[in-house]
Amino acid sequence: EMAQRLRDGRAVAAFPEGGTRDGEALGPFHARIFAAAVEAAAPVQPVALCYGPQCNAQAVIAFAPGEHFVGNLLRLLGEPVRQVRVCFLTPIEPDAHSGRRGIAQTARSQIEQAMAQA
């Protein structure tokens, strides 16, 4: 279904880490998430989300151990307002890389670099 949406020119959003983390480090990207882009020959748009002026609020925004979405939302509503920077990075064309694994590695590298430059 994701590949068909991409072929139809529609957007699909995914978080390639495939789960929640403590916000201290970028986790590994699951290559299977990019399979639909390869199948549909659709470009991938990496996006980095940086919380805080120097990406220094990542751990505050991240899910606490065992925390579910509603708990995270309620906790964040009690936090001070935080700046978020949304960085749209260089799109990745599937034909220019070695399949889904190459896309995953390139996307992760771009996002990691963007967060380090904050």
Predicted features and spans:
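Surface-exposed alpha-helical segments enriched in charged/polar residues
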Residues: A3-Q4, A35-V38, E112
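Membrane-embedded segments
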Residues: E1-R10
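A cross-family acyltransferase "interaction/gating" segment
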Residues: G23-S98, Q105-T106
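Generic beta-sheet signal
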Residues: R10-P16
